[in-house]
Amino acid sequence: MCIRDRLYAQAVDTALRTTGLETFEALREAGSAKLAQLPPDHGAEYGKAPLARRLQDIARLVRSGVGLQLAVTEMGGWDTHVGEGAERGQLAQRLGDLGQALAAFRTDLGERWGDVRVVVMTEFGRTARENGNRGTDHGTASVMLVLGGGVRGGRVVGGYRGLARSALFEERDLAIGTDVRSVLWESAAAQLGVEDPSPVFPGFRPTPAVLG
């Protein structure tokens, strides 16, 4: 199965799927069959996790120089209502897969990593405390990861109020400290030169730099 098919076979949104297929149709002229067989570079080892395979496909596109500007992928399995685990279990496995995939992606790109920015985010958080099934339920705030060229890494950015019940939103969830749009907008402005956020985030007013 070619890169195009792998990335869009499970796309739910019709507009996204159609646009993606049209974009990758152009890659046929660039030899996408050969591109799909391009091995990892710099000794990168992706492993077998689904996210790793998707990031490997994206790395192939970046390395091919076809002009890729934006790519979106996803990783499931985080809805751990039951048996979430701590240092071992579902959560630890997902975090391990995520870390390995990102590390391989960075290694594979080599010098091209300086031209790439990766944003990792979730659509909702988890409760701050365990439920009765040794898992966590849907919450409010969560964490984002930003890495790549132009990012001053090794830092935790944003406010953290702790886990005391009085510090939690509705006494159960982490409170939102940073608007997710601020991080996405800052990244889009830095990487793509976007000057007006309104087409993507109507009504949003950019805040001072979050990432610095």
Describe the predicted segments one by one.
Residues 4-108, 143-146, 155-212:
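Feature for exported/extracytoplasmic and membrane-associated proteins, marking the mature portion
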Residues 124-155:
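Histidine-centered active-site microenvironments of extracellular/periplasmic hydrolases
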Residues 65-68, 113-114, 139:
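Short gly/pro-enriched beta-turn/loop segments at secondary-structure junctions
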Residues 1:
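Sequence context surrounding c-type heme c attachment/ligation sites in exported
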Residues 102, 106-133:
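Metal-dependent active-site segment of extracytoplasmic phospho-/sulfohydrolases and closely related
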